[in-house]
Amino acid sequence: SIKELKKIDKKEVRMPQLEQELRGSDEIIGLGEDTTYITKGTIINGNIETDGDIEILGRVDGNVRCAGKLIISGRINGDIDTTDLYAEAANITGEIRASGTVKIGTGSVTVGNITAFTASIAGAVKGDVDIADAVVIDSTAVVVGNIKSRDVQVNSGAIIEGFCKQVHSDVDVDQFFKNGIESLE
């Protein structure tokens, strides 16, 4: 019927909008022509290595090396080396190393250390987080581990069980205390 066709048309028009909201960013929509897709229900037993992008909706039991963007809504049991990583409702067990950005979205759980240039964490992380530049710990985040960065932003509601240290900062904090309390008078 015409009523049913209108419902289908509305769903088709709304899907790109929903997909963009789910991913939370315009920057991850631009996957290249050389993208590898691991569909939901697919299980890969072994390592994956590609010069392109990867989108994982299924499960990978092995290490993943990706020269491009890695988008995960599935599960990875293994170490990850990539340029940028975007995890939304993902489960990751293993080390994450990214030369660019790591975004751990709400509903994602990662067990393993994270090393990247920048990061945004809204999910759960059990492991140390070492970020060369800025890290944002969102209000929905749970981090069990130490955080090292240049800049850190912790939003109200975030849970951190560990230490935060700005080791990559250019500020010499010892300089503020070199003359003791007398320098404040």
How would you name each of these model-derived features?
Residues 1-47, 101, 106-109, 115, ...:
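Intrinsically disordered, low-complexity terminal regions
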Residues 35-87:
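Short, highly charged
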Residues 71, 75-79, 83, 87-95, ...:
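Alpha-helical adaptor scaffolds
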